[in-house]
A protein has these predicted regions:
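Rossmann-like NAD(P)(H) cofactor-binding subdomain of soluble oxidoreductases
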Residues: 1-52
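Short active-site oxyanion
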Residues: 10-14, 62-63, 194
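Active-site substrate-recognition segment that forms the wall
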Residues: 40, 44, 50-52, 59, ...
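Short beta-strand and adjoining strand-loop segment in the mid-core
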Residues: 51-75, 125
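FAD/FMN-dependent oxidoreductases across multiple families
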Residues: 72-106, 153-154
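NAD(P)-dependent Rossmann-like dehydrogenase/reductase catalytic/cofactor-binding core
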Residues: 79, 129-222
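Active-site-proximal catalytic alpha-helix in oxidoreductases
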Residues: 92-137, 162-163
Length: 222
């Protein structure tokens, strides 16, 4: 991305509002001396038309950043607005919690072509708990301070969302766009391999997501 490198200097701070983990490492070769500010996004947005977007809040905060100079600089940009910013000294744990939420919410809705109502099924809940337990083990290996019952907490949070809410991957499927699969399930499988932590369920999910995403990239929306 030469255009991005050209915009970055030693005093530049680049906020990355993207799902997943390891943003700074992924962007290091593109931003030169600029500082990367990983930013967690909690709200849900659905494009209803060219000039219409449905905005839904999904918790007490809209963004989360690390409580460091970069995070504080990002938060200051939104002073005086209605956006609610959490600054945390343990950003890694927050990032993993959001990743865990996304690793069930996005894939399951996209693969089943159903909105959040699909998580009301007991069999889907059981599958989600197994996927989450596996992913949480990887997160702990990576240094995230996740609770022993983190999987149950994440699923409980998901079940508070409106049944008609969608996810970014679900909307990508409807629009015929490839998925951001490598940043979500792909990141869990890759991190698990790095720590020699087995991820059979997430690896199976990754295979299905890649197959579906590749078909969308080829123009097959079925």
């Amino acid at each position: 991305m030469p255009w991005l490198h050209g915009l970055c200097g030693a005093r530049t701070r680049l906020a990355v509002l993207q799902n997943g983990i390891g943003h700074a490492d992924r962007l290091a070769s593109f931003v030169g001396q600029a500082s990367v500010v990983p930013t967690i996004v909690y709200y849900n947005g659905e494009r209803l038309g060219p000039d219409r977007v449905r905005f839904r809040r999904a918790g007490e905060h809209d963004f989360a950043v690390s409580d460091d100079p970069g995070g504080r600089a990002f938060a200051s940009l939104l002073d005086g607005t209605s956006m609610r910013i959490l600054r945390s000294p343990d950003f890694k744990t927050l990032a993993w919690r959001k990743l865990l939420l996304n690793t069930i919410a996005n894939p399951i809705t996209a693969l089943t072509l159903q909105r959040q109502a699909v998580f009301r099924r007991e069999d889907v809940q059981a599958l989600c708990l197994a996927i989450l337990d596996e992913a949480a083990t990887v997160g702990r290996a990576d240094g995230a301070r996740l609770a022993p019952d983190e999987a149950k907490q994440i699923l409980a949070t998901l079940l508070t969302y409106p049944a008609d809410a969608g996810t970014s991957m679900y909307f990508d499927r409807l629009a015929g766009r490839p998925f951001e699969v490598e940043a979500l399930t792909g990141a869990i499988v890759e991190t698990g391999a790095r720590y020699q932590t087995p991820t059979p369920l997430n690896r199976a999910l990754l295979t299905l997501l890649r197959a579906t995403s590749d078909a969308l990239a080829d123009g097959d929306r079925r």
